[in-house]
């Protein structure tokens, strides 16, 4: 579940498309892990700088874009992790506009 930049975004999208929100979430958490930009050594890949840019020196914007695309894929395809509750309103796909509420990873509306 490691990786940096575009590879994390790509993996989030793949797990979301496979309907596995739990594994997609693990990668999102890796992407959002705070990184000290001045640290000389990092044990694991991934993470975000304090400005939320992807930590792949200097940075890879496609990592940020890929992870957000993966989150949209999770919401569109219903690959919701059990710990997620909330609602999505007006998420546009080529064929539809999606709005629903969800609790503990399950749609309620």
PLM features per residue range, with description:
Residues 22-109:
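Non-catalytic C-terminal accessory modules of carbohydrate-active enzymes
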Residues 1-23:
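Long, repeat-rich segments with strong aromatic
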């Amino acid at each position: 579940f490691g990786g940096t930049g575009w590879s994390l975004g790509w993996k989030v999208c793949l797990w979301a498309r496979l309907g596995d929100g739990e594994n997609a979430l693990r990668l999102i958490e890796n992407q959002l892990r705070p990184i000290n930009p001045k640290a000389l050594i990092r044990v694991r890949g991934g993470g975000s700088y304090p400005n939320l840019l992807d930590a792949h020196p200097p940075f890879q914007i496609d990592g940020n874009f890929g992870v957000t695309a993966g989150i949209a894929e999770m919401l569109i395809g219903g690959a919701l992790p059990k710990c997620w509750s909330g609602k999505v309103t007006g998420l546009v796909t080529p064929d539809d506009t999606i709005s629903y509420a969800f609790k503990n990873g399950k749609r309620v509306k």
